[in-house]
Amino acid sequence: MSRLKVTETFVSIQGEADAVGWTKLVIRLTGCPLRCVYCDTQYSFYGGEWRTLDELLVVARESSVRHVCVTGGEPLAQKACLELLTALCDAGYSVSLETSGALDVARVDPRVSRVVDLKTPESGEGKRNMLENLDVLTSHDQLKFVLCSRTDYEWARDLLRERAA
């Protein structure tokens, strides 16, 4: 049975992206290879508790919500994350994955909404973006940028213009 290291699970109201206002279960996985200067979840870098896929499916069922957001840290840093995403979809949940875009998203179950948080230059991790991820995103997925400055804004704008051409 596959296991994942989990920092926390909790029910919340989605505050950003296209699901704003939805009640969701958050499964925050432990660990992240990035160290963004503005990170607000540094507590998820270490520690956590090992949980099986079955245990996490029970948490989802007991939450009584239909939307599950898998986040981190960087959830894709754990190999079993892909299994968790598919298991949640198979169980009938609407699933989103919040990821940095520094790791490959191509193998994520296509039923999952991939929310890719590209790292801007002033994040301190801008060189870690795996821009090939943009080639596999669909209208079901989303891009996110944390803008720290005008420079970051211009970088994001230029990237989107280049990709749209």
Show where each model-derived region lies.
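Conserved AdoMet/S-adenosylmethionine-binding subsite of the radical SAM
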Residues: A77-A165
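Short Cys/His-rich Zn2+-coordinating modules
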Residues: I13, A17-G21
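Conserved Radical SAM active-site core
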Residues: L4-V11, T23-V26, L34-S113
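Short linear functional motifs in flexible/disordered or boundary regions
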Residues: D18, G48-R51, V68, G126, ...
